[in-house]
């Protein structure tokens, strides 16, 4: 396994770990932290996907923009997944930096469920890029 492949695997592992963390945080009613971990699960998985395509970015906004440009706008990723990643990007910022922000438990549960589907869908794209 070369260095790039090791980094891709690392990001994929981190994505799953963050989603597992989000579930634990939800059980402990730590909704802000759960939202943060959901976002990072998506971010790490998208970072792995972009690196598999030979792209790397230092800023979260760069990762988001490249994902939308390279995968959502081209139809390689369902637009709903793109919208979900965009929403979680905003929720994470609001939750981390906003004042008097509260998240509803049912919303966080739904976001975890959607994040599982997101990670699975991106996983398939990463595997396709590895085979290409």
From Swiss-Prot:
InterPro entries, alphabetized: HEPN_dom, UPF0332_toxin
Pfam families named among the record's database cross-references: HEPN
Coiled coil: none
Family affiliation: Belongs to the UPF0332 family.
UniProt protein name: UPF0332 protein TM_1000
